[in-house]
C-alpha cells in the first residue's frame, strides 16, 4: 500500500472531511513523499495551512530524500522513541530469529501500524475508496484505568528483557502495543480511559529509576497550575511498588472520541527533529 487518504476529524468540524491523498514511493533507495489536496478541501478551508512544507494549491507536492522524512504535519501523527520501539518489536514477532534490537521501520510503516484510537492529533488515515480507518477495530480501543497495573507489568517485562539484551515475550508486546505504540518520549507509557471517558497518558516507572519520577512530575504539574500556567489535568496513582504512575490528560482528545487537532513547534517552525546541531535552533525558538 503506497497511498493513504487523509481525513480531518477536527473537533470544530461538523463532520469529518477528507483532505487529500498522501503517497510514498521508493526511488533509488529513498522514500519520496507526495501529497495532493482535494479540491473540495481547499475550497472550504483555503486559509488553513497544515504545515510550512505544504502549500494550499492543487496538484502533487513532493518531499525528496530520507533526510527530509514525511511532511511535517503528518510527522506529528507518528510515534516517538517509546512508540517506535514497541512497533519495531511487534513487527519483529513474525521473525524466526527475533532479537532485542529489531530492524527499525520507516515513517510510512509506522504511520500504517499504530492504533487509530490513540494516534496523536486530528488526522485519520484510510485506504482510498474505503470507509474504514486503519487499525480502527473495536479490539484496539483504549483500555480502562482498571487495567493500569496490568499495563505497567507489561512495560516492566519489556524493559527487563531489553536490559538483558533478550527479545521480550510476545504476550507483553501485544498487550502494550495498541495503547502504547502511538506514544512519544523515551519512558514507558500507554493511553488509558477513566470512568468519565477522558483519555490520559499513563507514564510508568522505569526499571532504571532511582527515585519516584512520577511523583515529582505530578508535583511539577501542581506548581505550574498554582503559577497560573494552563496545564493538563493530572493524577497520581500509587502502585504496590515504591514508585508511582503519573497520569496526564491528553490535550488532543475530548470525551466521546472527539479529536483536537494539534501541530508541534517543529511543524509550526518548519524544522526537523534533531536539527539543532545543524541549524542552532532549540526550545527557545
Where would I find each of the regions flagged by the language model?
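Phosphate/dinucleotide-binding and metal-coordinating scaffold of catalytic cores
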Residues: 1-285
Amino acid at each position: 500500500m503506497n497511498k493513504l487518504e487523509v481525513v480531518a476529524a477536527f473537533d470544530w468540524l461538523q463532520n469529518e472531511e477528507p483532505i487529500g491523498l498522501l503517497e510514498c514511493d521508493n526511488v533509488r533507495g529513498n522514500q519520496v513523499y507526495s501529497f495532493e489536496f482535494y479540491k473540495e478541501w481547499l475550497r472550504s478551508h483555503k486559509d488553513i495551512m497544515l504545515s510550512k512544507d505544504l502549500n494550499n494549491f492543487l496538484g502533487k507536492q513532493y518531499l525528496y530524500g530520507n533526510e527530509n522524512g514525511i511532511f511535517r504535519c503528518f510527522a506529528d501523527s507518528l510515534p516517538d522513541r517509546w512508540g517506535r520501539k514497541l512497533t519495531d518489536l511487534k513487527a519483529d514477532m513474525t521473525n524466526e530469529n527475533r532479537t532485542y534490537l529489531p530492524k527499525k521501520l520507516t515513517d510510512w510503516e509506522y504511520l500504517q501500524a499504530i492504533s487509530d484510537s490513540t494516534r496523536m492529533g486530528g488526522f485519520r488515515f484510510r485506504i482510498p475508496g474505503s470507509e474504514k480507518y486503519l487499525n480502527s477495530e473495536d479490539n484496539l480501543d483504549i483500555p480502562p484505568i482498571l487495567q493500569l497495573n496490568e499495563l505497567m507489568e507489561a512495560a516492566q517485562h519489556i524493559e527487563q528483557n531489553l536490559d538483558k539484551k533478550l527479545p521480550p515475550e510476545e504476550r507483553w508486546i501485544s498487550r502494550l502495543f495498541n495503547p502504547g505504540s502511538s506514544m512519544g518520549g523515551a519512558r514507558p507509557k500507554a493511553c488509558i480511559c477513566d470512568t468519565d471517558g477522558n483519555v490520559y497518558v499513563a507514564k510508568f516507572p522505569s526499571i532504571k529509576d532511582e527515585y519516584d519520577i512520577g511523583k515529582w512530575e505530578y508535583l511539577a504539574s501542581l506548581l505550574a497550575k498554582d503559577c497560573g500556567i494552563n496545564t493538563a489535568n493530572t493524577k497520581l496513582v500509587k502502585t504496590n511498588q515504591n514508585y508511582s504512575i503519573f497520569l496526564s490528560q491528553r490535550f488532543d482528545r475530548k470525551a466521546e472520541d472527539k479529536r483536537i487537532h494539534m501541530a508541534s513547534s517543529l511543524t509550526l517552525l518548519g524544522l526537523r527533529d534533531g536539527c539543532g546541531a545543524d541549524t542552532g535552533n532549540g526550545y527557545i525558538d
